Amino acid sequence: LLSCLDVKLFGATFAGCTNVSVHGPVQINHGINIWKDNYIYSEQITSPFRNEASNKASNTDDDPDTENSMTTIGRQSRLEEGHYLHHFSVNPGNLDDISNIVGEGVKLSAADIEKLKVGMRRGVTWYDSASKAGCENEMLVWVELKEGSMLVLPSFATLINLEEEKDKDNGKCVYDFEALTNKLEDIKSSVESVEVYYNKQTCILKNLTKEVKQYDI
């Protein structure tokens, strides 16, 4: 069970002869839309599935034209534009207890962390479907604390500001990191590194210090 990367990262509960509960090191909070507008529109949709039960009730099973007309009509709502920010934390120490039982192999490795970072910064863009059309990853902010640090960072949801107006020259979203930069300055003795991965085609970053490593998402 613990050889599976998703279990090592997000945890699991296994009920069998012996009950095992793994509290995952990775915890992700609900997303908060930090864009100024929340314009939601709705549109009418029809179900692509045949309504066989209705056909039988009306004894029209042998009439294909009637069957094709039996559709379910509903509505779906969509957000015109939103920028959702999810705070998350990674605490490898969550696996200490279970590793004492089954061995060191269940601890998170550097390779595991790299796979997590790739998934977080590209997963939404890769997951393309009708319901997810138009959704793309925009940014990943990664703050690594020094070995042995017991510091608990606050949610970044209130420390990263998306300006109300896009850049007038190129229409890019402007993210202001002033509040987060000030917070990290206060705790810099506990911080090992700060990395920001962002989509350079859609974003502009402000008030990041030169110590912050910036990469294309």
Name these PLM-found stretches.
Residues 1-217:
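Basic polyanion-binding and macromolecular-assembly surfaces
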